[in-house]
Curated annotation (Swiss-Prot):
Extent of the transit peptide: 1-43
Protein name as annotated: Dimethylglycine dehydrogenase, mitochondrial
Native organism: Mus musculus (Mouse)
Sequence similarity: Belongs to the GcvT family.
Gene name linked to the record: Dmgdh
This protein's record includes keyword Phosphoprotein: no
Ligand binding ((6S)-5,6,7,8-tetrahydrofolate): E573, L574, T575, Y669, E676, L677, Y678, Y737
Enzyme Commission no: 1.5.8.4
Length: 869
C-alpha cells in the first residue's frame, strides 16, 4: 500500500502550486513590474482571461501583426485551472481535427523557449496507452487508420517494447500499447509566462489585476469593456475566462453550458527504482484503470478519472457563482474517491506500493457537456468569441490560440473544427443537462471509443419532436443537437439493446430491412431535427445571391446550395426554397443549425441587407416519405395533384394532407421518389398516423438515419461534415453542378474558386467498393497505394444492393480514375478497394428521365461522376 503518511493530507485545504520550479518565485516577482502601467482606450481585440489559452491567443494575434491586442485578467496569470494542471501533452486525440490542434501545440512548445528566452520545462519522453482487453486492441487498430494520414507519429507496440520503455510495469495483463513519440508534459506556469513574454514582445498589452465588470455591445458591433481601471472600446471580445466564463457570459445574457469539475492527482516522493532509471519514463495511460501516470522528478505523478458515481462536480458555482477571490486555491483532497484507481495503479506499477505521497492536488477544471471546448464566434451576439470549456487546456492552448488567431484575422477557420463550435449548444442546453453530461463525460474519459457511439445521460432534452412518444418504444434513438432521432427500428424478437462494436452489430440486419422498405415499397422517416430558417424582406434575394454559389431558385422551386468561405471552401450546404416572391425557406442539418445561422446573420449585417431572418427550427416538424409507392400513399390523403407533370422534382407547394397544412418539397436524401413534409410541430403525431394508416396496402414502414446513410451513399449524395466542410472546396468534392461561377452575383468565395479551378485540383472525391468481411468503413480511414498512405475515406456503409462495403474517399487526382485499385485500412488490415463510376444506384429522377427517353435504366450503372439530382 501507499504509505499512510498520505492520509494525513486528507481534510487539508492545500494551497500553492504543487510543482512550481524553484526559480518560479523569482520569475513571479518579476512578473508584476512587467505588467505595463499604460492603459488603452481602444483595442482591436480584448481577451478576457489570463490562463494558458487566453495568453496563447494574445501571443498568436500579436505575432501575426494585429495591433492593439489587450488581455485582461482578474487576478494574476495562470490563476484558475492553469497553475495546478498536470501539464500533459500528447499528439493523440480520437477526433480527426483535434489532432491538428495537438500537433500545433507541441510544435509551438518545442520552439517557444528559444523564441522567448523563457524556460518552459518541456519533457518529451513519449507516451503509451495500455490495452489489457481484446476490444481495446481493436480500438487501437481503429485509431491507427484514423491517424496514418496525419503528420502524427503513432504506433501499436508489442508487450516486449512496452516493457523496454517502461520497465517498472507488471506485464501480466498487457496485450499491446499505443505509442506516441514526442508526447510528454510541460510546466503550465512556465509555459504561460513564456507565451506572455512572447505576447509582450510582439506588442500585446497584458493587464492584471483587471477584472471585467461590464460588457456593453454597441450598435456598430463594437464593445465597451469596463474594468475598475477604466473602459476599453473593442472591435471584438474573446471570453477565455475558464471557470469564470459563465459569469462573463451572463453579463450579456448568455448562459454558457459549463461546469467546474474537481480533478485530483497525487505526487509521490522519490522512488529509488525511478531514480535509478537512465532515461525518463514515458507518460502512461492505463485505460481500464482510468488514470494517467508520469514521472515527476524522481517520483511519480498519478491522476485518475473517477466514475460518474464518485466524481464531484462543483455545482454550487453554477448556481451561486464562483466565490469572490478564488484564484490559486484548491479543494480539500479526498483519497477515498480515487482509492479504486490507486489500487489499480499499484497492481500495474508495483513500486507505487512503497511510495510516500507528498502532495495531493484537487483543483477545478471546466467541462462542457461533451468534454470538448467551445471555440469560435457565438451566434446571436456580434463579435463575441469564446475559448472556454477546456478539460485539457494545456495541450489545447497552443493550437487553439493559433486556430482562433487565424480565424479572426482571415474571416474563416483555417481548418474544419465543427466539433468545437460553441453554437452546437442552444437554449435546450439546460443546467440539469450540463451537469448530467459533464458527470458522464468525466466518468467516461477512458472508455472504449466506438464508432456510432451513443451516450445516454441527460436524455431526452426538452427538444423532442412531435413523434418522440410515438416512436421511442420501437426504435433505437440517436442524439442530434438536442433532438432524439431514430437511428434504426426493431421488430418483435429482435435484439433491441445498444451494442456498440467496431464490427457489424445487432442493427445490421434491421437496417437492411429498412433499406428494402424504401427501395421496394415506401418508408417514413422523422426529419424534424433539420435546422429551418425563414428569410424575407426587400433585400432577401440579393443576400442569398451573395451567400450561395448556386443560382436562386424560382418561386415554387427548391435547389441545393452551398455557402463558401472567402478561400472557396464549403462552409455549409442547405436547401433553398422560394415560397413566394422574396420569401425563402432554408433547410440545413441538425448539427449545423446555429453554425449556419450565425454566418447568414453576419453576412446580412456586414452587407447592410434589409432582411428579416427567423429561426423556426423548433416550431416545425418534418416527415420524409420515400419509395416507389410514396406518391400513391400521399395521393390518398390530398386533393393536390402529385403526378410528375403537376408536381415536379424540386418543386415546393403548400396544401393540406388530411386537413393538416403542410409545405411539401419533392426531394429525398434517399434518392428515391419522395417528399419532405413541413408542418406544425404539434401536428406531427396525427400526420404520421394518417400516413401510416393510408399506406397499409402498400406495406408502409419506418426507416431511420442508418438506412438513410446507406441509401444516400449508393446515390453518391455528399454529406456536409464528411465529404465537404471547411477543409474542402466544392470542385474537388464533385459539386460542380451546384456551383455557378458564371452567375452575375459576386458570391463569397467566387474569386478564390476561379483561382482554384485555374490552378487545377490536387485531389478528388471518389466512390469505392471495398471487399471486407465483417467490418465497414465509417470515415477517416487511411487509403493505401503501393505501400503508402495516399488519402482518406470520408464516410462509408454497407451497400445492401451489391453486398459490399461502399465508401467515399479523397485520393490524388492521378489515382482517381474509375477502375483504379487501392486499399482501405480497417482494424489493422488492408482491404482491396476499387474506384467505381458513381452513382452506384441511379436516383429516381435520373431513372425517370432515362425511361422517358426510352433508354435502359440499370439501377447499378451510373452515367457520370457527378450526380444530377
Amino acid at each position: 500500500m501507499l504509505r499512510p503518511g498520505a492520509l494525513r493530507l486528507r481534510g487539508l485545504a492545500l494551497r500553492g502550486s504543487p510543482r512550481r520550479p524553484s526559480s518560479a518565485g523569482l520569475r513571479e516577482g518579476q512578473e508584476s513590474p512587467a505588467s505595463p502601467p499604460e492603459w488603452k482606450d481602444r483595442a482591436e481585440t480584448v481577451i478576457i482571461g489570463g490562463g494558458c489559452v487566453g495568453v496563447s491567443l494574445a501571443y498568436h494575434l500579436a505575432k501575426a501583426g494585429m495591433r492593439d491586442v489587450v488581455l485582461m485578467e482578474k487576478s494574476e496569470l495562470t490563476a484558475g485551472s492553469t497553475w495546478h494542471a498536470a501539464g500533459l501533452t500528447t499528439y493523440f486525440h480520437p477526433g480527426i481535427n483535434l489532432k491538428k490542434i495537438h500537433y500545433d501545440s507541441i510544435k509551438l512548445y518545442e520552439r517557444l523557449e528559444e523564441e522567448t528566452g523563457q524556460v518552459v520545462g518541456f519533457h518529451q519522453p513519449g507516451s503509451i496507452r495500455l490495452a489489457t482487453t481484446p476490444v481495446r486492441v481493436d480500438e487501437f487498430k481503429y485509431q491507427m487508420t484514423r491517424t496514418n494520414w496525419h503528420a502524427t507519429e503513432q504506433y501499436i507496440i508489442e508487450p516486449e517494447k512496452i516493457h523496454e520503455l517502461f520497465p517498472l510495469l507488471n506485464m501480466n495483463k498487457i496485450l499491446a500499447g499505443l505509442y506516441n513519440p514526442g508526447d510528454g508534459h510541460i510546466d503550465p506556469y512556465s509555459l504561460t509566462m513564456a507565451l506572455a513574454a512572447g505576447a509582450r514582445k510582439y506588442g500585446a498589452l497584458l493587464k492584471y489585476p483587471a477584472p471585467v465588470t461590464s460588457l456593453k455591445p454597441r450598435p456598430d458591433g463594437t464593445w465597451d469593456v469596463e474594468t475598475p481601471q477604466g473602459s476599453v472600446r473593442a472591435n471584438r471580445i474573446v471570453n477565455a475566462a475558464g471557470f469564470w466564463a459563465r459569469e462573463v457570459g451572463k453579463m450579456i445574457g448568455l448562459d454558457h453550458p459549463l461546469i467546474p469539475v474537481q480533478h485530483q492527482y497525487v505526487v509521490t516522493s522519490t522512488i529509488p527504482e525511478v531514480k535509478a532509471l537512465k532515461r525518463e519514463l514515458p507518460v502512461l495511460r492505463d485505460l481500464e484503470g482510468s488514470y494517467y501516470l508520469r514521472q515527476e522528478r524522481d517520483g511519480l505523478l498519478f491522476g485518475p478519472y473517477e466514475s460518474q458515481e464518485k466524481m464531484k462536480l462543483q455545482a454550487s458555482w453554477v448556481t451561486h457563482g464562483v466565490p469572490p477571490g478564488f484564484g490559486k486555491e484548491l479543494f480539500e483532497s479526498d483519497l477515498d474517491r480515487i482509492s479504486d484507481h490507486l489500487e489499480a495503479a499499484m497492481e500495474m506499477i508495483p513500486v507505487l506500493k512503497k511510495a510516500d505521497i507528498i502532495n495531493v492536488v484537487n483543483g477545478p477544471i471546466t467541462y462542457s457537456p461533451d468534454i470538448l471546448p467551445m471555440v469560435g464566434p457565438h451566434q446571436g451576439v456580434r463579435n463575441y468569441w469564446v475559448a472556454t470549456g477546456f478539460g485539457y487546456g494545456i495541450i489545447h492552448a497552443g493550437g487553439v490560440g493559433k486556430f482562433l488567431s487565424d480565424w479572426i484575422l482571415h474571416g474563416e477557420p483555417p481548418f474544419d473544427l465543427i466539433e468545437l463550435d460553441p453554437n452546437r449548444y442552444g437554449k435546450w442546453t439546460t443546467t440539469q443537462y450540463t451537469e448530467a453530461k459533464a458527470r458522464e463525460s468525466y466518468g467516461f474519459n477512458n472508455i472504449v471509443g466506438y464508432p456510432k457511439e451513443e451516450r445516454f445521460a441527460g436524455r431526452p432534452t426538452q427538444r423532442v419532436s412531435g413523434l418522440y412518444k410515438t416512436l421511442k418504444s420501437k426504435c433505437s434513438m440517436g442524439f442530434h443537437a438536442g433532438w432524439e432521432q431514430p437511428h434504426w427500428f426493431y421488430k418483435p424478437g429482435q435484439d433491441t439493446q445498444y451494442r456498440p462494436s467496431f464490427r457489424r452489430t445487432n442493427w445490421f440486419e434491421p437496417v437492411g430491412s429498412e433499406y428494402k422498405q424504401v427501395m421496394q415499397r415506401v418508408g417514413v422517416i422523422d426529419l424534424s431535427p433539420f435546422g429551418k430558417f425563414n428569410i424575407k424582406g426587400r433585400d432577401s434575394t440579393q443576400l442569398l445571391d451573395h451567400l450561395f454559389a448556386n443560382v436562386i431558385p424560382k418561386v415554387g422551386f427548391t435547389n441545393i446550395s452551398h455557402m463558401l468561405t472567402p478561400r472557396g471552401r464549403v462552409y455549409a450546404e442547405l436547401t433553398v426554397s422560394q415560397q413566394s416572391p422574396g420569401e425563402f425557406l432554408l433547410i440545413t442539418g441538425s448539427g449545423s443549425e446555429l453554425h449556419d445561422l450565425r454566418w447568414i446573420e453576419e453576412a446580412a449585417f456586414r452587407g447592410g441587407y434589409d432582411v428579416e431572418i427567423q429561426n423556426i427550427t423548433d416550431e416545425f416538424g418534418v416527415l420524409g416519405v420515400a419509395g416507389p409507392y410514396a406518391r400513391r400513399v400521399l395521393q390518398k390523403l390530398t386533393s393536390e395533384d402529385l403526378s410528375d407533370d403537376a408536381f415536379k422534382f424540386l418543386q415546393t407547394k403548400s396544401f393540406n394532407i388530411s386537413d393538416i397544412p403542410v409545405t411539401a418539397i419533392r426531394i429525398s436524401y434517399t434518392g428515391e421518389l419522395g417528399w419532405e413534409l413541413y408542418h406544425r410541430r404539434e401536428d406531427s403525431a396525427t400526420l404520421y398516423e394518417r400516413i401510416m394508416s393510408a399506406g397499409q396496402e402498400e406495406g408502409i414502414g419506418d426507416f431511420g438515419t442508418y438506412a438513410l446513410n446507406a441509401l444516400r451513399l449508393e446515390k453518391a449524395f455528399r454529406a456536409w461534415g464528411s465529404e465537404m466542410n471547411c477543409d474542402t472546396n466544392p470542385l474537388e468534392a464533385g459539386l460542380e453542378y451546384f456551383v455557378k461561377l458564371n452567375k452575375p452575383a459576386d458570391f463569397i468565395g467566387k474569386q478564390a474558386l476561379k483561382q482554384i479551378k485555374t490552378e487545377g485540383l490536387k485531389r478528388r472525391l471518389v466512390c469505392l467498393t471495398v471487399a471486407t468481411d465483417d467490418v465497414d468503413p465509417e470515415g477517416n480511414e487511411s487509403i493505401w497505394y503501393k505501400g503508402k498512405v495516399v488519402g482518406n475515406t470520408t464516410s462509408g456503409s454497407y451497400s445492401y444492393s451489391i453486398q459490399k462495403s461502399l465508401a467515399f474517399a479523397y485520393v490524388p487526382v492521378q489515382l482517381s480514375e474509375v477502375g483504379q485499385q487501392v486499399e482501405v485500412e480497417l482494424l489493422g488490415k488492408n482491404y482491396p478497394a476499387t474506384i467505381i463510376q458513381e452513382p452506384l444506384v441511379l436516383t429516381e429522377p435520373a431513372r425517370a428521365r432515362l425511361q422517358k427517353d426510352g433508354k435502359k435504366t440499370n439501377l447499378e450503372k451510373g452515367p457520370s461522376r457527378t450526380t444530377k439530382l
